[in-house]
Amino acid sequence: MLRNCRLFFIVLLSSFPLNGFDPSPEGVWRTIDDNTHKPRGLVRLYEQDGAVFGKIEASLDPKEADQVCERCSGDRKNKRVVGMVVMRNMKKRGSEYAGGDILDPDTGQVYRCKFTLEDGGRKLVVRGFIGISLLGRSQTWLRQE
């Protein structure tokens, strides 16, 4: 009986996540269009030199598969959107990632950015803003993998 109780508590304790469990943002995320609310593309987040970056892996709209960023500036101007790094230099700060920027390939605008993982790492709430975070908009991306 005592052996069964010990076994029960071991199984019970091992089923709870550790306090230090912190899901990684790395992986493929499905973006959702702000207007249609339909899946729009896939963005792969990856770590490089201690920061998180995001690259567009695919467009889910066949009409946008060969789209170029005509409104972008600098080295992104007139480059294919698929394959483009749109999120740069995001660093972990407490429970969020911040300090980097995100590009809107439709407008060519670059915004300051922050994001948090929610729902056990299955959702990524991305906020792009100018100046202060209150002056911006958020999107929720869904983990693909």
Enumerate the language-model features and the residues they cover.
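Short, compact, well-ordered microdomains
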Residues: R112-K114, R122-V125
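Short aromatic-glycine motifs in intrinsically disordered, low-complexity regions
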Residues: C72-N78, V125-I132
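Bacterial N-terminal signal peptides that target proteins for export
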Residues: M1-F8
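N-terminal helix-cap/turn-to-beta initiation motif at the start of protein domains
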Residues: L18-V28
